[in-house]
């Protein structure tokens, strides 16, 4: 039986903290502010509160405000000049190439964003599967239901 390796995306395969997350957070604040008709400051506090409580801002927005997750992700993660924002980890391609077995991305990020990051980082073809927030029906990790679905889908024991 081959070993299965599970990788997160943001801040694992690339540095999202320094350039991408600040931009995504700003876009989330703007979207939440507009959608709920609240100040940017209140939107920022709500975004962080949902992140702390649910592991993903989107989960709180769906639960408490019936937000459309597809619209929200499109508005907050469709970044222009993306190439300049992505900083892959040093020796990423070489390191991943040394890992033998099935490799799967498991991320709370949206599909289009994830695929773009992997392609810009030149490691897209190195992964056998990509499991994104859409695949988990917008239930973020580390939620047990999301993990159970992920493990079953890829027959991981």
Task: Name each region found by the language model.
Residues 91-100:
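Catalytic-core regions built around general acid/base machinery
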